[in-house]
Each structure stands twice: as structure tokens, then as C-alpha cells.
Amino acid sequence: MLFSNMKIRNGRVVALDESKDILYQNIPIHIETDVGEIREHKNGQTTFYVPYGYIKNTKGIDNEEIDCFIGNNPYASNVYIIKLAKADKEEKTFLGFNTKEEAVLCFLAHYSNQDFLGETTELSMQFFKSILYD
């Protein structure tokens, strides 16, 4: 199953119901911020252009569940991980993007300080799934 509990609205992937729990290529994700929603932070606010959440029951380098942005390609064969340059232990995972460039553009659209963009790693979806719960 590629998408479960999701639909395409105005060319964007969105959660179907208020639970905001989805499956993306059988990866369980909780959507914290959906398309069009705004998050406030100390430097202003960010409008989200794609769904953003976390991969359930995982632990990232920050010891919290793995943060992820969900692009519009349910068949994407690669995953992109961007390390935040201003944070030693924070990275964002990009699922559903066709290219590294698309993932980077999505990152830049959601961060007002472009200096946060750090190293980007590309993994095959198959390899990513094999190490996800290690």
C-alpha cells in the first residue's frame, strides 16, 4: 500500500481525517502540520506547503521520533535526509520527492534562515526501510 488514510487535494497529499495517522509506502507517520497550516515559532511563523510530521516508533539522532516532510509522489524510490547546519543533532527526512533538488527546495520553503541547510543524503527507499527501526 502506497498511501493509506490520505488523499490528493489541489495537487497535494493531505490526511483524510483528524487522526492524522497515515501510511506512506507502509511507513507509519503522524502528521503534525498539514498543508496550509501555520506554525508559530520564536522567529515568526511558517506556512506549510506539504504535510509535516514524524515517523512513528522511531528514534532519530535527536532521540525523538524522525521528523519528515511528505511530498506528492506516492511512488518515490528515494529518501532525502537533510542535516540542519545550525544544529548538531537535528535532521529532516523527505519522503515522496522525485529528486534531491525537490527535497532541498521544500526545505528552503519552510525555513526562513537559509543557513540551516546542511548536508543532504540520498538513500533508496528500500535501504531506508531496512535501517529505519535499527
Locate predicted features.
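Hydrophobic N-terminal alpha-helices or hydrophobic patches in metabolic proteins across all domains
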Residues: 2-134
